Amino acid sequence: MRLWQQMGVAAALSLAVLGPVQAQTAGGSAAAASAAQALPASKPYVIAQTYTLQSQVLNEQRELNIMLPEGYHEHPELRYPVVYLLDGGQHEDFTHMAGAVQYASFSWVQRLPPVILVGIANTDRKRDMTFKASPKFVWPKWMHAYTDAYKNAGGSDAFIRYIETEVQPYVQQHFRTGPDKMLVGQSLAALLATEILLKKPALFNQYVMMSPSLWWDNQSLLKQAPQLLRNMPGAPMKVYLAVGNEGPEMVNDARALAALIRKHKPRNTQFVFEYLPKEDHGTILHPATLNAFAHFFPRPPEK
């Protein structure tokens, strides 16, 4: 008996021994394998490129995920605003926010001009997005279960230097960037964005901050805000702050920051605060970001 005949007989015997249900399963697996083999040729669907930097400031390798606007390579004469996204790793906020940026940039939506999206991926989020806390720092009761996760906290100063001296120069050197630079962050990332706004405001001229974790270090950044705001330069700037229905601590802190910004901001700073009661800490990112885009880039009037 030829080999293929032997194999055929063996397969038939196997199906008979397995019984009806197992035989169907085996047959289904064979059919699935056959269908898989019959799939037409495909190619990867690529929305961005990942670039690895050896950071001298942080002494570690870091990743940037960068999505270019449609038509970037076809129009070498154009330069583009840059949106820097904190929590910008592939398994963080980059992928879904890339979709939001693409959607907002559509010509029939017009909430955002074509931009370069730069996702700043994390290695130790709680280290990089928190400043050094005072020895008198008292953890909020609702954070007691998470304190061990903050054992490396207090590294925001170095992380801000990384953004200023390595990330921004890298992007400006390798891509056709325009003058506008937006920083987007939520939760701890919004705490960092608030710190940059107050202490290094010239790094960006547009800030989107959602649900900032101002509880950190007994609200010390909130307490420093009046003086820091008074010392800010008068260069034109756009600032958007939002909070959802996230409990009294988060809401009250965000409202307090909004009141301080309104009172002490430089004249050329355009500021918008929104309370979004239908959103919570997990859902606020997309609606608030799209609202910020709409405030920063009003749709031109229809002709």
Regions found by a protein language model. Give the residues of each.
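Sec/Tat signal peptide C-region and signal peptidase I cleavage site
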Residues: G19-A23
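Bacterial N-terminal signal peptides
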Residues: G8-L18
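Non-catalytic cap/lid and distal C-terminal segments of serine-dependent acyl enzymes
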Residues: Q24-K303
